[in-house]
Design a protein with these regions (language model features):
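Active-site metal-binding motif and surrounding structural segment of the metallo-beta-lactamase
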Residues: 18-77, 162-165
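Short, glycine/charged-enriched secondary-structure capping and boundary segments
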Residues: 34-36, 56-60, 89-92, 137, ...
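Core dinuclear metal-dependent hydrolase active-site scaffold
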Residues: 1-34, 105-158
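Structured loop/turn residues at beta-strand edges in well-structured enzyme cores
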Residues: 37, 102, 118-120, 161, ...
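Active-site neighborhood of divalent metal-dependent phosphoester bond hydrolases
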Residues: 69-72, 81-106
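Cap/insert and terminal regions of metallo-dependent hydrolase folds
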Residues: 151-195
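Short glycine-/acidic-enriched loop or helix-start segments at secondary-structure transitions
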Residues: 30-32, 53-55, 86-87, 134, ...
Length: 195
C-alpha cells in the first residue's frame, strides 16, 4: 500500500481575503493544483517542518503582476514558531538579500487576543501537541481549524462554541502521545457542539 497523502493544510477565502493555514513541504504542489495566484496571509499552527517546510515557495506570490511589484506575504504565528521561521529561512531576513528570496513579513500572535487579516477577524486557539509543546488553532468566523492537538484547556475550547464547522485532527484509533486519536477528537466535537 502506498502513502499518497499530502501534509495537512487549509485554505480559507472570505471577504476578499485568502488565507492558508500551514505551508508544509507540499505547499507548492497544493497551490499549483488549486490554481491559486494570490495569497494574503499564512497562519502557522506550529514550527514542525511538516507545517513550515514550504515557506520558501511563497516567492511565487511575491511577483504576480506585470510590471512586477513586490507583494509581501504576511505570516502569523506564535513567538516560538516565528523564531524557527527566522532561523530556518534566515536568507529571507538578511540585510543584503539576494534577488528572488521570499518576501515575507512576520507577525507575532498573542493567543489571548484576536487579530485581523484585512477585514477578517481570527481568533487563536491554544492547545498542546504534547505535554510541553504548544500548538495554535484558528477560528475564522464560524469555521475552526485545529491540527496536531493532543490536549486543549476548557477556556480555549470555549472559543470554539458557536462554530458551524470544526476541522480537528484524529490520527488513528489507538491512543497517541502527541495527537488526538479518534475518540479524543469526537469528545472535543461533543464538548464544543459545532453544527
Amino acid at each position: 500500500r502506498r502513502d499518497n497523502r499530502l501534509r495537512t493544510s487549509a485554505m480559507v477565502e472570505t471577504r476578499g481575503v485568502r488565507i492558508v493555514i500551514d505551508a508544509g513541504p507540499d505547499f507548492r504542489y497544493q497551490m499549483l493544483r488549486t490554481g491559486v495566484r494570490h495569497l494574503d496571509a499564512i497562519l502557522l499552527t506550529h514550527e514542525h517542518k511538516d507545517h513550515i517546510g514550504g515557506l520558501d515557495d511563497v516567492r511565487a506570490f511575491n511577483f504576480v503582476d506585470y510590471p512586477p511589484t513586490v507583494h509581501k506575504v504576511h505570516i502569523w504565528a506564535a513567538p516560538r514558531a516565528l523564531e524557527c521561521v527566522r532561523k530556518d529561512f534566515d536568507y529571507a531576513f538578511a540585510q543584503d538579500k539576494y534577488r528572488g528570496v521570499p518576501e515575507i513579513e512576520l507577525h507575532e500572535i498573542d493567543t489571548a487576543k484576536p487579530f485581523r487579516v484585512g477585514d477578517v477577524e481570527i481568533v487563536p486557539v491554544s492547545g498542546h501537541h504534547s505535554e510541553r509543546f504548544e500548538v495554535t488553532g484558528f477560528r475564522i468566523g464560524t469555521l475552526a481549524y485545529l491540527t496536531d492537538f493532543k490536549t486543549i484547556e476548557d477556556a480555549e475550547a470555549e472559543k470554539l462554541r458557536g462554530t458551524e464547522v470544526l476541522a480537528v485532527n484524529a490520527l488513528r484509533f489507538a491512543p497517541h502521545p502527541s495527537h488526538f486519536n479518534l475518540a479524543e477528537a469526537l469528545a472535543l466535537i461533543r464538548r464544543v457542539g459545532p453544527r
